[in-house]
């Protein structure tokens, strides 16, 4: 029976690849169904012989308890956005300062959810959401129900790949029809539907909704020397890669492609929101490197956002965690990019003056970055009142005088005891990119603050399970989960805490970079400004902000209290050791290693202070080679780069 089951699995997986990946099926649907039913019968009779790559894994229902957090071995960066031809020209100019004759590759920007797939010895072991780029959620069981994701690869590879999971428009229409018939609210757009589906705890629901994927990158160090070759390699492994792409030598060719895609956009079977432009050569990518937040070798051109007219009804003014007072417009409801919009940001007081926005104006509304509703401009021909908007002079939260500094565009409350600032700081501290305390969202924080149970972030760690039961709507099970989530967050690596403190100019990526160098928040608090400013990608503004923060008595007390409650202040990731053997060197691994796994070799190099990259460039300092090193060894020799073997690495 085992032989027949092997034959059926191999056949069915081949036919599935032909159907979903190649769009060239060699058998009829009825023949596929017949073979599938035969396999199901055999697996029912011999459950102990079910194979790991059996296609039946995709349809079985399983109710999950939840999604565990998963640390990405290779971080997922955001891309810099571009909204005009001029911004693309500026990107090209920056690239050409480092790379003389770049070739670009242009790919469609799929409007879906970023995913990371990890295979060990060719078997899918982890499917993870993007999350904050460093930590995502393990949704492996759900992604196994996406029919075009291979459960096994044709080679026994250890590899991590990146892509987008999306809902095709046809599937979206079918899902919404079913929801309508069942009296359920319809999804606003395919992206929301895909997101909601991947968050399902019942995997059978995922299997029914016909999600799909496009893969676009090998995240683990690539064995190919260009993005285009990497995409072709992904296709060879059985992944679906979007065929709509071009290689371009200049911005004129890129702009023509963007215009062509823009005209075809509405006729595609899936949603896109732009075009991603990357430097094709991976060695050139290594030369260009990264900013703190994004690669310097790529940009995402976003199509112009949909615009609608709405009438301004009133303006609300709210205080953020840094004291900035932000105006929000209340509008007559309009449908915009698949959702109903009745509120939109007015950015700041200077923006209101610049756009001359007045009471009862008709305004143009759009979604900035296809996400945040914003007022773009006034329709002056429809103006009905000359009366200017009322600009507040006192903080809407604490009634302190508001200040408008000469070098700032916004009004600001500088009262350190302002309730709104404290509460927003607590919300930020618990948020996903900071301490990531599951369940401790704005509504719970507001209730805790109103009940005087928390006044600063250290108070969060003094809460007991019974404290949550004092809050309206919180039951015993929820209270237990909240308490457990708070306790679990104590073990976070310290960059999460540093970002959570809300220090001005210190975002999540900067926090990680700082802790890689200083290893703990206590060390960082003692560092001088010159030492901080000398770190690559940082500078004087960040250094001064840190110095100002840590110089206050309040910060010293807060860190002491956090430590006393058991919150970790140390960095748990790979640190940069200033005096390590390979400190500051850029190293490439190539060829087949005999004794070390590639991941082990990479970890060892990084522990010795090296930066491990996938491509050889003029910035490469050292190449560690195994058997069958091939073209990378040849290129290293041509460039005069130092070459070492596995035995040398083991001896360090």
Swiss-Prot record:
It catalyses: NAD(+) + (deoxyribonucleotide)n-3'-hydroxyl + 5'-phospho-(deoxyribonucleotide)m = (deoxyribonucleotide)n+m + AMP + beta-nicotinamide D-nucleotide. The active site is at residue 109. NAD(+) binds at residues 29-33, 78-79, 107, 130, 164, 278, 302. Residues 577-652 form the BRCT domain. It is an enzyme of class 6 (ligase). Its EC number is 6.5.1.2. Pfam families: BRCT, DNA_ligase_aden, DNA_ligase_OB, DNA_ligase_ZBD, HHH_2, HHH_5. Its cofactor is Mg(2+); Mn(2+). PROSITE patterns: BRCT, DNA_LIGASE_N1, DNA_LIGASE_N2. Keywords: DNA damage, DNA repair, DNA replication, Ligase, Magnesium, Manganese, Metal-binding, NAD, Zinc. Coiled coil: none annotated. DNA ligase that catalyzes the formation of phosphodiester linkages between 5'-phosphoryl and 3'-hydroxyl groups in double-stranded DNA using NAD as a coenzyme and as the energy source for the reaction. It is essential for DNA replication and repair of damaged DNA. NCBIfam families: dnlj, PRK07956.1. Belongs to the NAD-dependent DNA ligase family. LigA subfamily. This is DNA ligase. It comes from Streptococcus pneumoniae (strain CGSP14).
